[in-house]
């Protein structure tokens, strides 16, 4: 199974990939990776036809553990799929790190 880090994912041309957010819909509405589509992990098998086969599909969940099963399902159906290491939490850590760096550089302590 292929994997990708959040840093690698964010460097890709978003028009050439599909990011599948497999977290529950309520978690997705609170925030997700830019451009991600919401298909909860329990629905991937029945809804995978919504995903374009001509683009690689990168799958995330909260931590990058539960999404592994969805990657295997997609691969078995002929998709070029990979798991996003660390899931949505890795995205949040990256964004927080960027904010702290900005805050430390600018001295701006206001949110």
Predicted features along the sequence, with ranges:
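Rhodanese-like catalytic fold shared by cysteine-dependent sulfurtransferases
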Residues: 1-18, 25-56, 65-111
């Amino acid at each position: 199974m292929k994997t990708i880090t959040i840093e690698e994912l964010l460097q890709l041309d978003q028009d050439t990939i599909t990011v599948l957010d497999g977290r529950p819909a309520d978690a997705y509405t609170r925030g997700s990776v830019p451009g991600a589509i919401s298909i909860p992990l329990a629905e991937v098998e029945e809804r995978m036809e919504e995903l374009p086969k001509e683009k690689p599909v990168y799958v995330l969940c909260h931590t990058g553990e539960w999404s592994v099963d969805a990657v295997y399902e997609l691969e078995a159906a002929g998709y070029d799929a990979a798991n996003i290491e660390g899931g949505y939490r890795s995205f949040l850590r990256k964004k927080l790190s960027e904010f702290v760096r900005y805050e430390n550089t600018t001295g701006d302590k206001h949110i």
